[in-house]
């Protein structure tokens, strides 16, 4: 029976998690990785009165308890989104396993990256912006709802975003939405009544900034497209034209980011900022954000910083 000291919860195909596992192996630090898409191939029993979970994976047995578990890397969405392409049985299985993973917060003595309760709270866009203001960071003028405020000007451009990350399925194809630039007149002509949206001040010209926070470490990068700032949502651009340039944040912005992370109880977060007219604006924080591409493109040692936290002696 193997007592698990370091637990990694991810998916079979996840390059970010692969980097962490390789780093832990390089250090000779033992861990157990369990993948959500393989859970029905594992034998798992949580014994409540013993506060212990027993797993059998490929013939090997493992034990997880608050006495021995020291760190957990949790790279998975907090909630499962249903798809029309899934059978009723698959929907039931995935929903129940998702709930089971959320219940692993019973192992509350370990160091989590991130604790699911903190992730759930931090995914709320309105709360993020409120937290940023309390932390002393600027935010774009923001309105949330299904009505266009009277202050919106017809001839001015605004950014429109979803309040939650929407995932759509059309003929078995998964689709996402990005931020969209719209004039005030276009907003008034649209059918906002059907669902709430975020309407924000359009920042231009701007430079997009991605700051990856891991504990006390910050890895900030400026994002350029063909060596210039980007109009609108940089994620819509051809990846081959994007470059990520490391830089140093002002100390007050660093302090504000740490306050946001501490306020939500996050150990890891992907923070988006915008630099416009020499002012730094907080856009959002993603507690389950991608980061592996920054190891290759910006040379950031993010996986090593995460491994440092996971490697509890």
How should each PLM-predicted stretch be described?
Residues 121, 127-172:
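Loop-centered beta-sheet repeat module
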Residues 6, 158-161, 211-213, 279-293:
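A short beta-strand motif that forms the metal-chelation/ATP-contact edge
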Residues 24, 155-249:
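Phosphate-binding site of ATP-dependent enzymes
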Residues 141, 197-198, 268-271:
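A short linear hydrophobic-aromatic micro-motif
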Residues 11-23, 27, 32-138:
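Conserved N-proximal alpha/beta basic substrate-recognition cap immediately N-terminal to
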Residues 3-11:
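Short hydrophobic beta-strand segments
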Residues 49, 58, 213-217, 276-278:
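Short acidic-glycine loop/turn motifs at beta-strand connectors
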Residues 245-255, 259-268, 275-313:
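C-terminal active-site "lid" helix and adjoining low-complexity regulatory extension at the edge
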């Amino acid at each position: 029976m193997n007592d698990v000291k370091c637990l990694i919860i991810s998916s079979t195909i996840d390059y970010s998690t692969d980097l962490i596992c390789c780093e832990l192996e390089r250090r000779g630090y033992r861990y157990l990785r369990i993948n959500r898409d393989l859970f029905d191939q594992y034998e798992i029993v949580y014994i409540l009165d013993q506060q212990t979970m027993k797993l059998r994976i490929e013939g090997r047995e493992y034990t997880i308890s608050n006495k021995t578990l020291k760190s957990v890397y949790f790279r998975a969405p907090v909630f499962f989104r249903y798809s029309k392409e899934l059978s009723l049985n698959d929907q039931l299985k995935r929903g129940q396993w998702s709930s089971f993973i959320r219940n692993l917060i019973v192992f509350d003595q370990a160091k989590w990256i991130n604790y699911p309760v903190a992730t759930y709270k931090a995914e709320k866009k309105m709360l993020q912006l409120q937290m940023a203001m309390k932390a002393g960071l600027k935010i774009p003028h923001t309105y949330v709802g299904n009505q266009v405020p009277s202050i919106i000007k017809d001839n001015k451009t605004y950014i429109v975003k979803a309040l939650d990350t929407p995932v759509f399925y059309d003929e078995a194809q998964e689709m996402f939405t990005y931020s969209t630039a719209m004039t005030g007149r276009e907003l008034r002509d649209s059918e906002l009544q059907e669902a709430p949206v975020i309407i924000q001040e359009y920042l231009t010209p701007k430079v997009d900034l991605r700051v990856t926070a891991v504990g006390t470490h910050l890895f900030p990068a400026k994002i350029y497209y063909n060596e210039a700032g980007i109009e609108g949502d940089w994620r819509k651009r051809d990846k081959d034209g994007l470059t990520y340039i490391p830089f140093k944040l002002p100390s007050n912005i660093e302090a504000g980011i740490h306050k946001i992370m501490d306020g939500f109880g996050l150990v890891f977060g992907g923070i988006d900022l915008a630099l416009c007219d020499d002012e730094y604006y907080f856009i959002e924080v993603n507690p389950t954000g991608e980061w592996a591409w920054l190891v290759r493109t910006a040379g950031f040692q993010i996986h090593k910083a995460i491994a440092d936290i996971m490697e509890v002696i």
